[in-house]
């Protein structure tokens, strides 16, 4: 029976957010450096002649998927809750390139 192996690729990106309605300093716009670990579990490819022989996943493909799904959207973005008053007047989205309005409180736990 083949053994399942886990491989992990780590990514680092910077993002700003504000916690609307929070009674503390994090209600203000501030930023963090995030460390994202993407883990893929699978069986090592043992098919002779296959270009991915010996691999669970092609790290180049994993990097591209992570870039498309997460990094292009969140890296150097300002993330705000979509029902916060400052997200409705159009000022932030109109004056900054990467403002992402989300339907949840953009805390580290929710992200």
Walk through the language-model features, giving the residues of each.
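Charge-rich, low-complexity N-terminal segments
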Residues: 1-111
């Amino acid at each position: 029976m083949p053994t399942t192996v886990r491989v992990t690729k780590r990514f680092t990106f910077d993002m700003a957010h504000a916690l609307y309605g929070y009674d503390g300093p994090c209600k203000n716009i501030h930023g963090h450096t995030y460390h994202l670990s993407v883990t893929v579990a699978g069986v090592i490819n043992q098919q002779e002649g296959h270009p991915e022989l010996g691999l669970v996943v092609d790290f180049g493909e994993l990097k591209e998927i992570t870039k498309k799904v997460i990094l292009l959207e969140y890296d150097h973005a300002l993330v705000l809750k979509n029902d916060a008053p400052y997200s409705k007047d159009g000022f932030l989205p109109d004056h900054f390139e990467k403002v992402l309005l989300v339907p949840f409180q953009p805390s580290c736990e929710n992200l």
